[in-house]
Amino acid sequence: AQALAGSIVKFAVHLLENPGTLPEAVLSRIAHKHTALGIVEEQYPIVYENLFWAIGEVLGDAVTPAVADAWTEVYWLMADALIKIEKGLYSQQANDRMWTDWRVVAKEPTGNAAVTFRFEPADDTPQSRGRAGGYVSVRLKVEDGLRQCRQYSLSEKAGSTTERVITVKLDEGGEVSPMLIQNVEVGDVIELSNPYGDITLEDEDSTAPLVLATAGIGITPAAAILDALAQQGSDRQVLLLHGDASWE
């Protein structure tokens, strides 16, 4: 809720400072995240009702009718823009499903407290080609029986339609990474979203120098970009800057 409220405030500030324009970069990032979670148009009124109920509970009498009307207008301006972008992103996919089944075909320890999972499709659903730097959502049941989603960068073979590769770092206080690393084994089937991501290697034929700056497990999208460049035999000049707590 805090992230959502912050995004709406940033959107409002942009409208005030740049009349007649939209914050395209911010909207694109949010839209890619939404589509990776399977968010659809029908859910926006539900979000609106709950968000504005929470605002009223916290701010009380400060939320006058005029204030409520102003922020309602901002919310729906932002929502309508996102809905349009998200419909476009969904239409670009090879299937119309939010989640498809993928089978774990390999599970490999990678560095310090990280594991690389390799998946192949568990059925004949057409699959989309991802982009280096992009990500997929993983959805699985956690200990309380509820389904949780997390996004993981494609760390290798991002453009494949027959394989997905992600590298997961263990977050001992988390819900999803411990379940993946400790409970999911080769042969298991889990749900993945279609690939999304707004910071990707768009122009694979470019010869312009490329700088990649990463830290920790954030190396994974950069690894996918390097893999894609290597696969196409690119002679592009690349500078990788990486910081980590361990040489492992």
Residues covered by each model-derived region:
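Ferredoxin-reductase
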Residues: 95-189, 230, 244-246
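Charged, low-complexity, helix/coiled-coil-prone segments
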Residues: 1, 6-23, 74-83, 124-129, ...
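Short, functionally important structural connectors and interaction interfaces within domains
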Residues: 22, 31, 122, 172, ...
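Alpha-helix initiation and capping sites
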Residues: 2-5, 130, 148, 216-219, ...
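Globin-like tetrapyrrole-binding proteins
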Residues: 1-99
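Generic structural "secondary-structure junction" signal
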Residues: 29-32, 39-41, 156, 178, ...
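Generic detector of short, locally flexible boundary/turn motifs and exposed helical patches
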Residues: 16-18, 66-72, 81-86, 102-103, ...
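FNR/FR-type flavoprotein reductase catalytic core
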Residues: 47, 178-248
